[in-house]
A protein has these predicted regions:
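Short, glycine-/polar-rich solvent-exposed loops and beta-turns at beta-strand/coil boundaries
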Residues: 95-97
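Acidic/polar loop patches that form or flank catalytic/metal-binding clefts of enzymes
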Residues: 237-239, 278-279, 358-359, 394-397, ...
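An often Trp-containing, charged/polar helix-loop segment at the C-terminal end
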Residues: 17, 440, 489-553
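Active-site-proximal alpha-helical segments within enzyme catalytic domains
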Residues: 476-489
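Short clusters of hydrophobic/aromatic residues that line enzyme substrate/ligand-binding pockets
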Residues: 386, 414, 428, 462, ...
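Substrate-binding/charge-relay-adjacent region of secreted/lumenal peptidase catalytic domains
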Residues: 2-93, 102-103, 107-394, 423-470, ...
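Active-site core of glycosidic bond-cleaving carbohydrate-active enzymes
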Residues: 473
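Polar, glycine-rich mid-to-C-terminal structural blocks
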Residues: 390, 394-430
Length: 572
């Protein structure tokens, strides 16, 4: 049968350079997504479960109920499996996982299967190399049965959202007044600012805060213990467990940078004290044997967020976290559309199972690249994914106290891929009315707007590799907000009620209750060059989103007040 293109990129995403052809013997593990049944019903069901007042509100689904809902028709799986077998893919290299089929083949076979050529691409910013292609096809008779096959056109530019890391002189161990929090942020600052006080969650096996680790970032126990001794001396018995996904390591002696992991653990665990904390370390490694041509396959063909999402969706109900916080993201346009859709669907399924999925919004303000990659070179603002997925809660950044103001690097804006969900219509329309024609044409005014909320994101004191450092980035705000939600869940479970799950319809429905509206400051961006490569990029003079009354694309609905949110959740 003739081939039909599944996906095509006009050029590699920003920062990636095409190099030599991939070695024919290099093994790649592919994941093929099949069309799911019931996709429209699923969307409605997810919203019903998350909408206060609906009869299904917080009636979360079990793992096996979700699996049954998303399983493709048997005839579909059978036809795709038959194609792989006919093309000579060995049976023991094929794994049928319901919604996905995984298969591992050398590049030479993959090129025949997908009618394409694979090349090595080099990322100028990170030095990473990946085997990818700019387009791939499948035979016409199965084209409608294949949603996507990855890794092909997805260039993983995962970046942790850490901006500034500054070594600190020895820090005094004092009780901190709120005034000191203008200079540095510690757990005490956040406990005062967000009205958490000395709250201690009841120990409950059903409540778990999950922290995502990627890119060989390791959470070190020694650093964590020293952090507790200095900044949470009443909580020195706090702890976390490590769960390895797909061969992820948690190397206690690594000399690699691990500021991201330290930041997430230090604050998520200290602020949700007594809730079980789990660090999920994901390597995204295929079952590959290194050879000369590809000495470290892990760098080349990893798909860490799909690996992590699939692992979590496969967990038994009693092992699932009730909150998952993740501090990384990438330019939305650098992802193949089908990949963004699929991972966003997986976040939605986690929400339906009762997980509050929380992401940092990004550290690029209105954007860095600020130029369309579809060949048009049109100047535009850059939305960040996964923050732009309507099924995650995206957290922007603030700085300073009395009053808090938007931090200039806090990413926000409007998705070019996902339409604006109804739950945020009212809040976002009111902002767009105030904005008028300002920045018209640089953003998609009908897109999903983000962030949803905000929290402190600069000058955090962190212990990393035996040193005190000050860290900034929306990486810091996501675990803080997640810890507050974990505490709300602890109180709900104690009262015999289910946890919050997907948060956004509830958060927007509070109409400002439980939040401090941030009205000072704004973001910046689109400087005209990419800082880490020096290459030219889209330039928008004075590019900015302002923090204003009500929702805005820098601080969302504002910063959380735990004492009010817990009352609202309990219906008081």
């Amino acid at each position: 049968a003739p081939f039909q293109v599944v996906e095509r990129l006009s050029a590699p995403p920003d920062g990636w350079i095409k190099k030599e052809k991939a070695a024919p013997s290099a093994q790649i593990q592919f994941r093929l997504g099949l069309p799911q049944q019931n996709s429209e019903q699923l969307e409605q069901l997810a919203l019903n479960i998350a909408t206060p007042g609906h009869e299904l509100y917080r009636k979360h689904l079990k793992r096996d109920e979700i699996k049954a809902l998303v399983r493709p028709l048997a005839s579909v799986s059978e036809k795709v499996l038959a194609w792989l077998r006919d093309e000579g893919v060995p049976e023991d290299r094929i794994h049928d996982d319901g919604a996905w089929i995984k298969f591992t083949v050398p590049v030479s076979t993959a090129e025949k299967l997908l009618n394409t050529e694979f090349f090595v691409f080099h990322n100028e910013r990170t030095g990473a190399e990946q085997i990818r292609t700019l387009e791939y096809s499948v035979p016409q008779d199965i084209h409608s049965l294949v949603k996507f096959i990855q890794p092909t056109t997805h260039f993983s530019s995962l970046g942790p959202q850490v901006r500034r890391v500054v070594p600190l002189d020895v820090l005094p161990k004092l009780r901190i007044t709120l005034e000191d929090c203008n200079k540095k942020i510690t757990p005490d600052c956040l406990k005062q600012l967000y009205k958490i006080g000395d709250y201690v969650a009841p120990e409950d096996p059903r409540n778990r805060i999950g922290i995502s680790g990627y890119l060989e970032q390791f959470a070190r126990y020694a650093d964590f213990e020293e952090f507790l001794e200095s900044y949470a001396p009443d909580r020195t018995d706090a702890n976390f467990t490590v769960v390895s996904i797909n061969g992820g390591r948690n190397d206690q002696n690594s000399t690699l940078d691990s500021t991201e992991a330290s930041l997430d653990i230090d604050y998520a665990v200290t602020l949700s004290y007594k809730t079980q904390a789990v660090y999920y370390t994901t390597a995204g490694r295929g079952p590959l044997v290194p050879d000369e041509s590809q000495p470290d396959p892990n760098e080349v063909s990893n798909e860490p967020y799909m690996e992590q999402l699939q692992f979590l969706l496969d967990l038994p109900d009693e092992e699932l976290p009730t909150v998952l916080t993740t501090s990384y993201g990438e330019n939305e346009q650098s992802l193949p559309g089908s990949y963004a859709d699929e991972t966003c669907n997986m976040f939605r399924l986690l929400g339906m199972r009762g997980v509050s999925v929380i992401f940092s919004s990004g550290d690029w303000g209105t954007g860095i690249v600020c130029k369309a990659n579809d060949g048009s070179e049109r100047i535009k603002f850059d939305p960040v994914y996964p923050a732009s997925c309507p099924y995650v809660t995206s957290v922007g950044g603030t700085t300073g106290v009395n009053p808090e103001r938007a931090v200039e690097f806090s990413s926000g804006g409007f998705s070019d891929r996902f339409p604006r969900p109804k739950y945020q219509d009212e809040a976002v329309r009111s902002y767009l009315t105030k904005l008028g024609d300002h920045w018209k044409g640089l953003y998609n005014e009908s897109g999903r707007a983000f962030p949803d909320v905000a929290a402190q994101a600069d000058n955090f004191v962190v212990r990393d590799q035996g040193q005190w450092v000050s860290v900034g980035g929306t990486s810091a705000s996501a675990p803080v907000f997640a810890a507050i939600i974990a505490n709300v869940n602890a109180e709900l479970l104690k009262a015999g009620k289910p946890p919050l799950g997907f948060l956004n319809p509830w958060l927007y429905g509070l109409k400002g209750r439980g939040f401090t509206d941030v009205v000072h400051g704004g973001s910046t961006g689109c400087p005209g060059t990419v800082p880490w490569t020096g290459l030219p990029a889209g330039h928008v003079p004075y590019a900015s989103w302002n923090a204003t009354e009500g929702w805005d694309p820098v601080t969302g609905l504002g910063t959380p007040l735990y004492d009010e949110l817990v009352k609202a959740a309990l219906g008081k």
